[in-house]
Amino acid sequence: MKNIFTGIFLLVSACFMQAQTPNYYRNPDKIYLDSKEGHNGSFTWQMHKADETKDPAEKISQPGYQTGKWMPAIVPGTVLNSLVHNKMYPEPYYGMNNKLDRNIIPDLAKTGREFYTYWFRTEFDVPENYKDKIVWLQVDGINYRAEIWVNGYLLGNMSGMFKPEYINIDILRFEHA
């Protein structure tokens, strides 16, 4: 009788472990712009506080823009994720770090949204084997508002928490051809 309970327990444990295994499936027909920092992705993302950036969006979003002293960014992730990664603030989910009355991590309600408004940028190439495909940029990590700029063009605005948005960037591929 003891062996039956052990067998059932092991079966149930295996089911729970399987249920908690994250799904890392990546569609081979897509390019994922995950950052090297934090996600071991293939792309170098950088960020800079918007009100400290004097250049216009048309220039910042151009290939080859010199970022100078921009910080590494975690993508997908939030502004706060990247600020914590860069040791600007402590981990909010540790101890009492995020408690309002401690004033360790600035609260948006007190600072205003400009405080957490940053430029995020990376550069990527559309592979040659995408030549006969329509190319979409899928953005699904925005929290809370963003303008999407590519190659000097404003392609869209979005707002909401982490909702996916799909932007056709196919026309830009042929701009410099």
Per-range role (PLM):
Residues 8, 13-14, 36, 83-86, ...:
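Low-complexity, intrinsically disordered/propeptide-like segments
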Residues 19-100:
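Accessory carbohydrate-binding/adhesion or oligomerization-edge regions at the termini
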Residues 98-109:
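Short glycine/proline-rich turn/loop motifs
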Residues 9, 38, 63, 128-130, ...:
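Generic structural signal for beta-strand residues in well-ordered domains
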Residues 1-22:
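Bacterial Sec-dependent N-terminal signal peptides
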Residues 21-30, 48-52, 86, 91-92, ...:
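Accessory beta-strand-rich segments of carbohydrate-active enzymes
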